[in-house]
C-alpha cells in the first residue's frame, strides 16, 4: 500500500512498535515504510502520519503491521499513534537530504518496566544503550499557541493516563542553520513548532522514588534564537555519577520574548505581561522538577542548573528571578554573553524592548513597537510609518491581540533581520520587575540581588572564533560549508581580542561581582585546541578553544559536536584519548558541584583542588582545562581588564584591514575620540 505525495521533507524508512517497544529506523531513500508490532505481534490499523509545514498524510498499518509512503527528500515530522491504553507524544522531526547515502537510526522504544507514576500520569520510557533509563517528550506545559501565545506557560492537568515518553517533542520555532543541524536547503527557513514545551529525563536504571539523587537541569544555548534539548543527552552523566539529568525546550525569538503590555488584558498575570515567555518556560521547568522529579528518584532539594551561551544567560536569569527562590541550589554558567558588544540585546530595560526608536527613551530598532509598525505597513493597514504609529495608538487591546496572535509564525519572523546566520537581531530578556529585576546584570550581581548558591562560571579561550566563521568580513564560504579565511593575520587578531573581551565581562567582571556577595564562586577557562590540520584547514587555528566546544566535556560526552557539520573537523582518533580524559575531568567537577556543592577535587577526589575565586590578581584563582598532552588541568593566575584590553587594542598595528580594525574597536568599546580620529 503505497501513496505518493510531494513534500519539502526528509526521508525516513522504518518505524515499528515491537516487544513492548516503539522503535523507528530511518534509512536512505525517499520511502517511508515500516512494521508495527506490540510484544512481537504485528498490529493492524495503527495510524502513522508524515507531515511537513504545508501538508500531512496519514495511513494505517496492514494485517502484517506494515505501512509505506513514497516521498521526495526533505524534512518530515513522523508520528505514530500511541497503542491502545497509552497517550502522549510519539513523533520526531527528522532532517535528512535525499542525496545522503548514510543510514541514520531514530528509535522510539517503549519498555513497560520503566513505568514511573507522577501526579501528571504514569510515564513509560526506554533504556539507553548504556543501561540508563530515559523519558523523552514529557509535556512540561500546555501548547503555547493560539490564545496561549505570549502568555505564561500553563501547567498540564493532573491525570492517571499511561503516557508515552519515548521521543523528544518537536523543537520550538526557529530558522534552519548549521548550528541546529538543518540541511543547507533549509537555511533561513522556518522549522519547529509552537507546540514545543517538552522535557527529557535520564536516570540510573535502579533509581527509585526514595533515592533522592542530585538533579542536573541543562539549559541549551543558541542566542535565544535557535537550539533544542534533543541535541544533548544526559545518559553519560547519569551512568557515571548516579545523577538525574533533565533538559527541556523553551520558546525563542519573538515567540519567547515580546514585550507589549498593551496586548494583554489588565486582568492578566504580571508574568504574562512581562514579555519574558522563554524565561518563564525556564522557570516552569524548574517548577515541574520541583513537583515531579522525586518520582524519578531525584531530590527536589538538590537541583543544579547549568547552561551555555544563551543557556548561561538564562542560568543568570534563574539566579536573579524572584520566581525561582528555593527551586535550585547550585549553578554553572558556561560562556554567558553579557554585553561586551555595544549593541548587545540581552537583558534589556523595558524601554529598549518596547519603545519606538525615535522616542525620548529610544527602543531597539526591532523593539516590539517597531515590529508592529512594520507589520501594519506590510499588511496594508497603514500607508507609511506615521500612519502605522497613529493606528497602533488607536487599536484596542482586543484588536491588537487578535491581530498579533492571528499572525502566522512565518509572517512574524519575516519582520526581523538576522545576524551571523539564523540569530535574530532583537531584544530578548526584559527587566520587567516581576520575572527579571528592573536592574542591569552587573548591578544585580554586584549588589547581591540574586539567589546566592555555589557557582561555577567561565569562558573559552577562543570564544569568538566560532562566530568569525560566519562573518563575511573575515571568511568566505565555499559550497555553503567550507570557510576560507580571507586574511589569517587579521582573523587571529580579531579572534584574540573579541574573545578576550568576552572573557573579561562574562568571567572576570562577573566573578568579581558575585564574589562580593558569596565565597563559593569557582572560575574556569577552557583551553582545548587539539583539532586536526585538514591540509587547507588548520582547525586549531580556525577554531581553537571556541564557543560551545566545552559542552560535551561537561556532559562526559567527548564526541558531542553542537554543530554536527563540524564533527569531522573536531574529532579524530588521534585526539580521542585526550578528549576522553578531559571529559572525565570536567564532568567530574560539574557532577561534584551537583552532589556536594563544591567542585573540590572531583567526584573521586583525585583531581587538582579547585579553589574559590579571589580578588587577589596575583593568586592562582582560575582553573584552566586542557589535556594531559598539552598543559593539563591546573590552577593558574588569571587577570584581564577592559582598560588593559583597550590599551592593547589601541597599540595594535598588526591589522592589514583598517575597516576590520575599526569595526572591532567600535564593537567592543564603542565610538570614542581615539577611533574617530582613525576611522572615517
Spans of features found by a protein language model:
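Short, ordered, surface-exposed loop/turn motifs in non-cytosolic proteins
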Residues: 38-54, 73
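A short, solvent-exposed beta-strand micro-motif common in secreted/extracellular proteins
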Residues: 74-85
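A short, amphipathic beta-strand motif
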Residues: 32-38, 65, 108
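Short, acidic Ser/Thr/Gly-rich low-complexity loop/linker segments typical of extracellular
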Residues: 52-66, 70
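Substrate-access "cap/lid" subdomains that shape
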Residues: 184-185, 291, 317-320, 325, ...
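Structured interaction patches on ligand/partner-binding surfaces of diverse proteins
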Residues: 83-106
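Mobile gating loops/cap/lid regions near enzyme active sites that modulate substrate access
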Residues: 512-680
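Non-catalytic accessory segments of hydrolases
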Residues: 111-276, 300, 565-583, 597-601, ...
